[in-house]
């Protein structure tokens, strides 16, 4: 992560600070400075006109100091800076020193276009009136053209900046913009307006490519329905220029490694997110369809088909956010349905289904916390799910449609050495006192939970998983970015049901993985794990029964919409 840009010319700032109110600053992110030309830098003001004391006598005994226009600092705080001047003979030089002291105090507090002005005044009574000009940001001008609407960027800067203008607030707003996945880089310059304390922010915004598309191959499905799958995925970071995102994929299953099952194995998902406010309130819509056919012997002769649908709508709102911490809250409504056919006829196989049908709805509340620093990243999300009885649920009598589950996911990534070795710890937890259908149960086994076992090796109402691993960089590019990681890992999990047999079943493994990520759109991973619990091998031809999990994704991004951006060096 690149650090926030620094002042372009500190010498100019000091010179201008000593001449009056500081009215120019440029922020850059390791890029060429916008708008430089021969002679004086663009945006650097000439010294302010002389605002000295017109009617002041050569010397006067200063009896008091009054302040006008200050809101950031109280009269008492400002007076404390210059109180030693009171009671002494004061001339023009001393008055200028008072003005500079107060202006310096504003500048040191990052109010870079605020300061003190001593207007022409009659000081025969010994009282000095110091006028405080507290600066403001009047306009944000995006100087180039792009697909992303300018209001998306400017509103998020205004969200962080208030009057009077503080440099720390402005840098924070710019950093939030820079971190946005739609933005590749920004160039900014803070330039003076026509009046004292008035400033404008000029920006050049370079957007990321809008669309991405790719292909993937993996063995991340249960072997019973064909572990290998081919995937076509696509996405856009900015579909309609409002900053909205759309992501989708379509997958085909494969029976063993011999024949692609196009008719019955096609699954797809779509997820759409629309920002509603400058506070990053987002509307999220989702749809997922999964159609499976049991391919594994001896059940493949029964012609068992499963059709599952999921619909969701949600709102997400950040509650607190700074450059290191973010706390957000998501409220989501979700409806799931499943239909099972055996030889073309509805048939109840899974517990809780009625004539092969299952329908459930739930309201999910998810607080989420993220912490980021140079050394570590911590992310945690907990989801409280409340089953609903209002939307015509279809469940067996032994299941309560108004169920409750509590699920937690957390990860800790820590840099443990100077050569970019990472310690990664992942935690999963689900708890419920209710008996829930398989769509709401937690699965243990597979590359995302307990490596070295089949996907969905255990499916239980309650579960706990911890997975520590070390990621050793074994190959880096010329810039020092790690491309290949060697990953030893240990996975441990335990699962149990809420009703019926409550025996806790443990599942644990150890192994080694390797990942290769040469670009943002190309990734490869291979994991081998040894499961220490023997559940019996049902298909000697499946790689998952040998503890092997793989994935390959090849993609590309296209359409750079930015016009008149600063060229890359």
Language-model-derived ranges and their functions:
Residues 230, 311, 327, 363, ...:
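Hydrophobic core residues within well-ordered beta-strands of beta-rich domains
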Residues 1-16:
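N-terminal secretory signal peptides that target proteins for export/translocation
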Residues 20-32:
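Bacterial N-terminal signal peptides
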Residues 147-151, 163-370, 531, 540-562:
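Gram-negative/organellar outer-membrane beta-barrel architecture
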């Amino acid at each position: 992560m690149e650090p926030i840009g620094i002042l372009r010319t500190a010498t100019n700032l000091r010179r201008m600070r000593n001449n009056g109110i500081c009215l120019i600053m440029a922020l850059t992110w390791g890029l060429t400075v916008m708008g430089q030309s021969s002679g004086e830098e663009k945006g650097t003001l000439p010294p302010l006109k002389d605002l000295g004391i017109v009617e002041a006598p050569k010397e006067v005994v200063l009896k008091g100091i009054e302040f006008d226009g200050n809101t950031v600092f109280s009269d008492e705080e400002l007076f404390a800076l210059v109180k030693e001047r009171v009671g002494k003979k004061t001339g023009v030089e001393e008055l200028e020193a008072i003005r500079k002291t107060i202006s310096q105090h504003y500048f040191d507090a990052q109010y870079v276009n605020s300061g003190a002005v001593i207007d022409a005044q009659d000081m025969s009574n010994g009282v000095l009136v110091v006028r405080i000009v507290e600066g403001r940001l009047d306009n944000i001008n995006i100087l180039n053209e792009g697909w992303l609407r300018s209001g998306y960027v400017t509103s998020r800067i205004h969200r962080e900046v208030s009057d009077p203008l503080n440099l720390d607030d402005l840098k924070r707003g710019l950093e939030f913009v820079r971190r946005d996945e739609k933005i590749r880089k920004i160039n900014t310059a803070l330039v003076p307006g026509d009046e004292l304390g008035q400033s404008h922010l000029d920006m050049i915004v370079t957007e990321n490519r809008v669309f991405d598309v790719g292909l993937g191959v993996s063995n991340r499905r249960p072997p019973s329905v064909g572990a290998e799958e081919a995937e076509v995925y696509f996405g856009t970071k900015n579909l309609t220029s409002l900053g909205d995102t759309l992501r989708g994929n379509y997958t085909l299953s494969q029976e063993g490694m011999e024949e692609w099952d196009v008719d019955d194995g096609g699954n797809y998902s779509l997820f759409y997110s629309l920002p509603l406010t400058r506070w990053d309130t987002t509307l999220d819509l989702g749809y997922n369809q999964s159609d499976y056919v049991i391919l594994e012997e001896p059940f493949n002769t029964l012609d068992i088909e499963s059709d599952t649908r999921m619909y969701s709508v949600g709102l997400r709102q950040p509650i607190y956010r700074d450059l290191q911490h973010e706390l957000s809250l998501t409220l989501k409504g979700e409806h799931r349905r499943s239909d099972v056919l055996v030889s073309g006829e509805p048939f109840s196989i899974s517990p809780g289904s009625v004539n092969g049908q299952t329908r459930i709805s739930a309201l999910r509340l998810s607080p989420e916390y993220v912490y980021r620093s140079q050394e570590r990243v911590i992310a945690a999300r907990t989801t409280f799910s409340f089953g609903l009885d209002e939307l015509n649920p279809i469940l067996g009598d032994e299941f309560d449609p108004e169920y409750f589950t509590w699920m937690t996911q957390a990860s800790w990534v820590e840099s443990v050495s100077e050569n970019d070795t990472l310690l990664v710890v992942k935690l999963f937890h689900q708890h419920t006192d209710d008996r829930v259908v398989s769509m709401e149960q937690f699965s243990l086994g597979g590359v995302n939970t307990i490596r070295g076992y089949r996907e969905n090796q255990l499916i239980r109402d309650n579960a706990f998983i911890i997975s520590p691993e070390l990621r050793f960089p074994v190959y880096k590019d010329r810039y020092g970015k790690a491309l290949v990681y060697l990953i030893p890992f240990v996975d441990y999990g335990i699962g149990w049901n809420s009703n019926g047999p409550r025996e806790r079943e443990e599942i644990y493994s150890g192994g080694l993985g390797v990942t290769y990520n040469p670009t943002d759109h190309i990734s490869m991973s291979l994991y081998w794990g040894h499961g220490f619990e023997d559940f019996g091998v049902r298909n000697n031809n499946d790689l998952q029964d040998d503890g092997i999990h793989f994935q390959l994704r090849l993609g590309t991004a296209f359409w750079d919409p930015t016009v008149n951006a600063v060229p890359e060096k």
